[in-house]
């Protein structure tokens, strides 16, 4: 029997969903603490930091400083994750308020670090396996599954390989065991994630690793629904798109950050791909019935000229992505682009404003296309007194939108799970919908 200590833990997980999986592993090791959202009352404050781009680093630092100010006497403040790893040589002196620092290699040893009150930085990047206990947060029906760590790409702007290392894929069998274990606990919707999902098993000499995973999950039949995030253009193929399309479990959801469309910019960004390849993949994705396509763009990479930006702008308006993340270039140490001549901030801001207008127009169109017709959805939890929170089954959690259920044709109380719903109204970036039936 697991006995709770009379101690409280406040966990703050910053950054991406991959970081969240590592945070959930740490919660699994600290199961005997009582969770609290109040840092002031916590005996342990654990901040899993992000160190991806400048804005994320600033958020991590500010969160640490706020926690240091709020923590009660005798409480332990821990900074783990990417920021700590990336700046491990200087961070201890820069933020002396922190009691324990650890990077990206020791999430499964967090209980030992707290007991010994000591820092720990291992050389090997941690990759969660099926035997690592996790406490899933945020949902009783959805879980993330991390399939690999690190990245072998050499993008000019990205520092991730410098602190996350080279591609390190999990064994397929380990992933299947984790999926089965989580499904038995009621998690029947999953999102598979990595830095570069489409390169899964490349490090083990297999070019069709993600296709193998899709087919194995289909055969296993433990899940009702799933989707994949972070496809990389150079390792995405028409065969992979076809495997997703033909899967009864994986949704027709395509998240492929293209970063740019101009051939000259793709070369400057060292993306190991071309406009022609991008277009071939994107057109194939669009041909898939009821596909949902998300991408990411970087604006203002060094040497991006006006004609390259105009080419990007025209393409985005023509293609009409369902969702689009638009980032300003962030100059990061230990990257090729760091020392290149920068595009003026004023120019970057103007370009972002123009692209945001295009993105919002097509995003709203994508939302409105769901109105007044039955769609498959996942109801996750109650939202306030009168609503339930749901999402289109194709969507990834948090990032693609929100549906509020305000009516139901069921004769029994609504609970988290898979339902057919009918959206009836789109207001303030939220869809309102009625539940029709479970499936």
Curated annotation (Swiss-Prot):
Enzyme class: transferase
Residues that hold [4Fe-4S] cluster 1 according to the record: 16, 50, 82
EC numbers, comma separated: 2.8.4.4
Binding, [4Fe-4S] cluster 2: 151, 155, 158
Keywords of the record: 4Fe-4S, Cytoplasm, Iron, Iron-sulfur, Metal-binding, S-adenosyl-L-methionine, Transferase
Function: Catalyzes the methylthiolation of an aspartic acid residue of ribosomal protein uS12.
Protein name: Ribosomal protein uS12 methylthiotransferase RimO
Protein source organism: Helicobacter pylori (strain ATCC 700392 / 26695)
């Amino acid at each position: 029997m697991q006995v709770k200590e009379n101690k409280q833990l406040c966990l703050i997980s910053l950054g991406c969903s991959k970081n969240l999986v590592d945070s959930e592993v740490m919660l699994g090791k600290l199961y005997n603490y009582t969770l609290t959202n109040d840092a002031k009352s916590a005996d342990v404050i654990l901040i899993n930091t992000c160190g991806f781009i400048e804005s994320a680093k600033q958020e991590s630092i500010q969160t640490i400083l706020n926690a240091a100010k709020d923590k009660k006497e005798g409480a332990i403040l821990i900074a783990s994750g990417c920021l700590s790893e990336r700046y491990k040589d200087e961070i201890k002196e820069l933020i002396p308020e922190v009691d324990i620092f650890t990077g990206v290699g020791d999430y499964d040893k967090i209980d030992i670090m707290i007991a010994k009150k000591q820092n720990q930085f291992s050389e090997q990047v941690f990759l969660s396996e099926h035997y690592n206990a996790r406490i899933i947060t945020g949902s009783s029906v959805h879980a993330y599954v991390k399939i690999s760590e690190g990245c072998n790409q050499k993008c000019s702007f990205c520092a991730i390989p410098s602190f996350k290392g080279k591609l390190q894929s999990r064994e397929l069998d380990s992933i299947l065991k984790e999926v089965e274990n989580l499904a038995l606990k009621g998690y029947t919707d999953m999102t598979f994630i990595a830095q570069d999902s489409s390169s899964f098993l490349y490090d083990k000499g297999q070019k069709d690793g993600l296709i193998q995973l899709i087919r194995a999950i289909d055969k296993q039949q433990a899940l009702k629904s799933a989707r994949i995030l972070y496809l990389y253009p150079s390792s995405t193929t028409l065969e992979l798109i076809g495997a997703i399309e033909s899967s009864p479990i994986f949704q027709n959801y395509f998240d492929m950050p293209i970063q740019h469309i101009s051939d000259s910019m793709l070369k400057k960004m060292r993306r190991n791909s071309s406009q022609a390849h991008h277009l071939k993949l994107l057109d194939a994705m669009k041909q898939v019935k009821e596909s949902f396509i998300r991408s990411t763009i970087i604006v203002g990479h060094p040497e991006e000229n006006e004609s390259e930006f105009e080419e990007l702008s025209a393409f985005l308006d023509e293609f009409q992505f369902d969702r689009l993340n638009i980032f300003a270039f962030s100059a990061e140490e230990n990257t090729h682009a760091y020392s290149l001549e920068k595009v003026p901030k004023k120019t970057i801001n103007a370009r972002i404003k123009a692209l945001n207008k295009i993105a919002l127009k097509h995003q709203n169109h994508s939302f409105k296309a769901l109105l007044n017709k039955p769609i498959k959805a996942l109801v996750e939890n109650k939202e306030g007194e009168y609503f339930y929170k749901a999402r289109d089954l194709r969507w990834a959690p948090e990032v693609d939108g929100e549906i509020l259920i305000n009516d139901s044709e069921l004769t029994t109380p609504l609970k988290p799970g898979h339902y057919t719903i009918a959206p009836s109204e789109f207001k303030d970036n939220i869809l309102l919908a009625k539940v029709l039936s479970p499936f």
